[in-house]
Amino acid sequence: MTHAEIAEAKTDTAVRQAEYDNQRAIVFQQIQEGLIRANAARRLVDLYRNTLRPQAEATLKATAAAYQADRTDFLNLLDSQNMSLDVDISYFRALAEYQSRMAELERAVGAPLAAPEVKQ
């Protein structure tokens, strides 16, 4: 091998190493961002499951009991029902968002992840 060929091989190796390092940094950034988004989506699912849905259900039950006791009108009962349904819809949207974020994270990692189970 001549000096020119050796120099060219070293340059080619350095270029390939830089490309590898750049791609690795991009993937690492995608993983970090994916993890942040997945964790945020998971926290939202937990908020709906542990707080908002039970509150909406309790409000609906209380309003239904008040309606049966003739202490509130039918419109309030319908409003409580709509609120409960809206919370349920938002919960399932948040759950779908979480699952989508986990799928994105798996694509970035390149392997299936053992995500914590999210109960419906």
PLM feature spans:
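Amphipathic alpha-helical coiled-coil segments
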Residues: 4-90, 97-108
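Terminal intrinsically disordered/low-complexity segments used for targeting and assembly
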Residues: 106-120
